[in-house]
Amino acid sequence: MRHSNKIRDEEMVNNTRLNXXA
């Protein structure tokens, strides 16, 4: 299940960008 890990990482980055807001 490596694909799930990659998708999770991308979601985490997207969340950080939104939080960030920047």
UniProtKB/Swiss-Prot annotation:
Superkingdom as given in the UniProt entry: Eukaryota
Polar residues composition-biased segments: 13-22
Region (Disordered) residue spans: 1-22
Post-translational changes noted in the entry: The N-terminus is blocked.
Biased composition, class Basic and acidic residues, residue ranges: 1-11
Note: On the 2D-gel the determined pI of this unknown protein is: 7.5, its MW is: 38.5 kDa.
UniProt name for this protein: Unknown endosperm protein L
Taxonomic source organism: Hordeum vulgare
